[in-house]
Each structure stands twice: as structure tokens, then as C-alpha cells.
Amino acid sequence: MISIELMSEENSIDVYSFEKENREYFERNLPPRPANYFDLEGFKEITRELLTGQRNRAVYMHLIRNSQGVMVGRINLSVLESDRNTAELGYRIGENVNNLGYASEAVKLVLEKAFTTYGFNRIIAGTATGNLASQRVLLKNGFTFSRVIENDLQIHNEWVHTAVFEIRRP
């Protein structure tokens, strides 16, 4: 059993610790965060910007906690500027708790909030075409494959193709 909670000033230190602890793991497969993300003062400034975005309903940043209350990941919804009824889903699960079902549960919980609390009509999500585990998480939660964006991201000087999935309000 997990829970998700919106990021706040009070719990942002958990996000900072989580990101620092998992930095090398995430950077193996994702573009690196800016350097100031891992400096406490820089992170506080980034957090202030994110919380402003959250108050303005541009983003919804959630912490994922296990049954003991430990932060095991994060899951976010970013509103598309071109379509305010659509948000892009993104998530990260910590290396030491990977493959325990947390991502599937968190996606289920955030979709409930997205459609009922936040009022979105559609959620999109992208994964590297080789990231079959994340694709399974999305499919398990009712997403359908939409398209591939070729050469979408550059990670470690290699172009990565993105598989895009979407789900609409039931």
C-alpha cells in the first residue's frame, strides 16, 4: 500500500534527499538535472518555482510514500500549455525499491486525482522505446500507445526515441 501527497515546502527536503540518493541511478537513463538541483540553496529556489507552478495549476508534483511513510518515488503531472485539459505524466522510483509495484500503484492513484480532483480530460506519458517496464506500467493502467517520436532526447550523446501513450477520462 502506498500513498501520494502533493509536494510542499515542508516535505520538499524529502524530495531533495531522494534525488541526491538516486542521482547516479537516474542519470544512467534520463537527462541529468541541472547542477544547482543538488545544491540545497539551488534546490530551495527550484522548489519555490515548482510550488508557484503548483499554486497556478501548471504542475502537480507528488511524493510517493510506502506504507511506512518513506519516500520511494515521485510522480508529476505537467499541464500542457497548448491544451489546459491535458497533462503529461512523469515519475521516478528509487533504485532500491524498483520492481516492487510502486510505479503501477502510484500511476493508478495519480490518474484518479487527475480525472476527479484536477479535472483533466487526457493524460499523456512518454517513455524511451526501450523502457519496457515503464510501458507495462502505463498499459496496466489503461494507457494506449499513441506514437513514436524519433530522436526525441539525447542521453549520454545518444539519441533516444520516445514511445508516447495516452489515456482519456473514463
Model-derived features with residue positions:
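Acyl-donor (CoA/ACP) binding surface of acyl/acetyltransferases
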Residues: 1-14, 18-28, 61-170
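A short helix-loop-beta-strand connector motif used in the catalytic cores of GNAT acetyltransferases and
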Residues: 35-36, 48-63
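Conserved GNAT-fold acetyl-CoA-binding loop/helix
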Residues: 27-48
